[in-house]
Amino acid sequence: MAIFIRKTHPLLKIMNHALVDLPAPSNISLWWNFGSLLGLCLIIQILTGLFLAMHYTADVSMAFSSVVHICRDVNYGWLIRNIHANGASLFFICVYLHIARGLYYGSYLYKETWNIGVILLFLLMATAFVGYVLPWGQMSFWGATVITNLLSAFPYIGNMLVQWIWGGFSVDNATLTRFFAFHFLLPFLILALTIIHLLFLHETGSNNPLGINSDADKISFHPYFSYKDLLGFFVMIFFLTTLALFMPNLLGDAENFIPANPLVTPPHIKPEWYFLFAYAILRSIPNKLGGVLALLFSIFILMLVPLLHTSKQRSNIFRPLTQIFFWLLVANSIILTWIGGQPVEQPFITVGQIASVSYFSLFLIIMPFASWCENKILSLN
């Protein structure tokens, strides 16, 4: 009876169907590991964040000092802080690779799973943004000021909206307190949505590299993919610990070692590296409202991808034309990330504008047209 308790117990039965006896396609590659890696990232971030919250003080006069206190006086506080800060970067690397895999292999045709995923991305970006403000360094303060100020672009309600978010007439104590509250709350919302994301995924089953129905060739998740995921865990933890122990400030900004000063503006205000592609799109449009809308659309365009799928095949694996444009999109996103970190001057302005137009064109026009051309070529044969 003990052997089958996982199949009969009301709680264990749910876990069993999700992690043990789940039928999975036999040919899913390493690209399918990123879902579980994201789960691990989320757990690491929640646990390290919880310990940091025990020692952090959400007050403008003490926030910076409390972070210094964590790094100097708390047992292994420096390690917890470095893992949390670099864990966010690794989280976004895994997210972007997970999305890229979904785009390449046509996983977006599971519309419910995909759309929940896009909402998860938006929440993750919001969490990372409010978290970046908490150390109350120069880039934290000015990043919060510049990004929240963008809401003033909305007609009629803009200025009121900004003051409502700030809790006053400038970024101050009320802003920091509420951002800390949001940063604590949002990961649990992400956790809840992740469960819904998995629920929708298990309704349809996983996609596979060929993009075809794999019902005839399924294997159980455990032990095959559980061990495969475990290997991914070890590799990711190795990278995270290497980053946190040897190069903890590699992906951070030197300006954040200076306490926030509303009277001194940093020479170049920029967000963390994982937002730079969207920041470059925002900056490439001279109009403020247009820039804000383009920024939002650069994320929410992912929701249109299932509607723009014109190909008769699901995966890109047998579609050389679409493959070329997919890799162009990847290269374009890397260029946008680089441009976002550069000062606003020529030739960076022009390159950013070309890359921004290319980004939207590839999604909305070029890739759907390439799929249509491939359909025509196939029908000729």
UniProtKB/Swiss-Prot annotation:
Gene3D superfamilies registered for this protein in UniProt: Cytochrome Bc1 Complex, Chain C (1.20.810.10)
Cofactor: heme b
Cellular component GO terms, alphabetical: mitochondrial inner membrane; respiratory chain complex III
Residue numbers binding a ubiquinone: H202
A single MF term (Gene Ontology): metal ion binding
Record key words, sorted: Electron transport, Heme, Iron, Membrane, Metal-binding, Mitochondrion, Mitochondrion inner membrane, Respiratory chain, Transmembrane, Transmembrane helix, Transport, Ubiquinone
Superkingdom, taxonomy of origin: Eukaryota
Coiled coil: none
Binding site for heme b b566: H98, H197
InterPro entries: Cyt_b/b6_C, Cyt_b/b6_C_sf, Cyt_b/b6_N, Cytb/b6-like_sf, Cytochrome_b, Cytochrome_b_C_euk/bac, Cytochrome_b_N_euk/bac, Di-haem_cyt_TM
Gene Ontology BP term (one): mitochondrial electron transport, ubiquinol to cytochrome c
Bilayer-crossing regions: 34-54, 78-99, 114-134, 179-199, 227-247, 289-309, 321-341, 348-368
Residues that coordinate or bind heme b b562: H84, H183
Membrane topology of the entry: Multi-pass membrane protein
Cellular compartment(s): Mitochondrion inner membrane
Record's subunit section: The cytochrome bc1 complex contains 3 respiratory subunits (MT-CYB, CYC1 and UQCRFS1), 2 core proteins (UQCRC1 and UQCRC2) and probably 6 low-molecular weight proteins.
Role summary: Component of the ubiquinol-cytochrome c reductase complex (complex III or cytochrome b-c1 complex) that is part of the mitochondrial respiratory chain. The b-c1 complex mediates electron transfer from ubiquinol to cytochrome c. Contributes to the generation of a proton gradient across the mitochondrial membrane that is then used for ATP synthesis.
Other comment: Heme 1 (or BL or b562) is low-potential and absorbs at about 562 nm, and heme 2 (or BH or b566) is high-potential and absorbs at about 566 nm.
Cross-referenced PANTHER family: CYTOCHROME B
Protein family (similarity comment): Belongs to the cytochrome b family.
Protein name: Cytochrome b
Species this protein is from: Sphyrna tiburo tiburo
Lineage: Eukaryota, Metazoa, Chordata, Craniata, Vertebrata
